[in-house]
A protein has these predicted regions:
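Radical SAM/AdoMet-radical enzyme domain recognition
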Residues: 1-104
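Short, electropositive alpha-helical surface patch
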Residues: 67-85, 136-156
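A structural motif corresponding to the C-terminal lobe/cap of the Radical SAM core domain
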Residues: 78, 82, 97-123, 153, ...
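C-terminal accessory region of radical SAM enzymes
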Residues: 106-143, 171-221, 227, 237
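Short, small/polar residue-rich loop motifs at catalytic or cofactor-binding pockets
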Residues: 157-161
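Short, acidic, Ser/Thr-enriched surface-loop or helix-capping motifs
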Residues: 166-167
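Cysteine-cluster motifs in flexible loop/terminal segments that predominantly coordinate metals
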Residues: 211-257
C-alpha cells in the first residue's frame, strides 16, 4: 500500500517515476488483483501526484479487459496519470493456467487502433515492446514518444542490450517477462556492474543469431533490424527464442491474418 509515509520515502529516495498496474475497471481489476486493490491504486496516484511524482499506469491486455480500454483511459485522465503503458498478457505466471484469457494475434489490430486514436495528448500512451511491428500507425505512435536523437522505429528487443530488470528478490533478468532460467545473477551476490559487464551475461540476446529465426520471420525483410520482436512473446507463445512471432502486425498483414 502506498500511503503518505511511503510516498515521503519515495520522494526522499529521489525516485522520480512510479508505475502502478491498472488491469481494468474496478470490478475487473479487483477480480485480478484482489478486492479493494483498484481503489487503493487510484488513491496512490492521488498521493503521488500531490508529491510531484510522475505517475504511470500499466495495463496488461487480456480478453476480459480488451473492451474496457476506453473506460480505463477516462479513469486515468481523471486521476491525473501522466503516462499509460499497454502491454499484452502472455501465457506465463497466472496466465499460464488460463491460456484462454490471452488475446489472439488477430486482436493486435484492435489494440493498435485504440492506442492510435487515444493518443490525443491527454496522457502519454506507450505500447510495450510486445506490441508491434512496422505498421504506419505503430510508427506514428513511436514518433510521438521518441526521445530527441533516437530513431522512432522498432530496432529489436533491448533486453540485455540497453536495459535490464531487477526483481523483488534481487535477481537480474533482461526484461520483466523473462522466465527464471534466464536469470543472470543476483545483486545480493554480485554487483550490478559485474553482472552487466560479464562477457557471458545475456548471451541469449547479445549473441542472438537472427538467421536462426523460424517461419515468416526467417525471410522477413525486417529481420536484421527486428530480430523477431519481443523475446518473451516468442518464448511463451512459440516455445523458443527463435520461434516465429505470430504477434506481429507486419507478419499478419502480409499473410492476411
Amino acid at each position: 500500500m502506498i500511503d503518505e509515509e511511503t510516498v515521503q520515502k519515495i520522494s526522499d529516495c529521489g525516485i522520480r517515476s512510479i508505475g502502478i498496474s491498472i488491469d481494468g475497471g474496478e470490478k475487473t481489476h479487483d477480480t485480478i488483483r484482489g478486492t479493494g486493490c483498484y481503489q487503493k491504486a487510484m488513491e496512490a496516484f492521488g498521493r503521488l501526484k500531490k508529491a510531484g511524482i510522475y505517475c504511470s499506469a500499466v495495463t496488461t491486455v487480456m480478453k476480459n479487459n480488451l473492451e474496457e480500454l476506453a473506460d480505463i483511459k477516462k479513469e486515468l485522465n481523471r486521476a491525473g496519470v501522466d503516462a499509460w503503458q499497454i502491454q499484452l498478457g502472455i501465457p506465463k505466471g497466472n496466465l499460464s493456467d488460463s491460456p484462454d484469457a490471452v488475446v489472439e494475434p488477430g486482436d493486435l489490430e484492435k489494440i493498435l487502433d485504440f492506442c492510435y486514436q487515444a493518443a490525443d495528448g491527454s496522457l502519454s500512451i506507450h505500447m510495450a515492446d510486445c506490441i508491434g511491428y512496422y505498421s504506419k500507425k505503430e510508427n506514428a505512435l513511436r514518433r510521438l514518444n521518441c526521445p530527441e536523437g533516437k530513431i522512432p522505429v522498432w530496432q529489436g528487443c533491448q533486453a540485455g542490450l540497453s536495459h535490464l530488470t531487477i526483481r523483488h528478490n534481487g535477481d537480474i533478468v533482461g526484461a520483466s517477462m523473462c522466465p527464471p532460467d534466464m536469470t543472470e545473477g543476483n545483486i545480493r551476490e554480485r554487483t550490478l556492474r559485474e553482472i552487466w559487464e560479464d562477457e557471458n551475461a545475456f548471451a541469449w540476446r547479445r549473441k542472438f543469431k537472427p538467421e536462426l529465426m523460424e517461419g515468416f520471420c526467417h525471410d522477413c525483410q525486417y529481420l536484421s533490424l527486428c530480430h523477431g520482436g519481443c523475446s518473451a512473446i516468442k518464448i511463451f507463445t512459440g516455445g523458443s527464442i527463435t520461434a516465429e512471432n505470430k504477434y506481429c502486425l507486419y507478419r499478419n498483414t502480409m499473410l492476411g491474418k
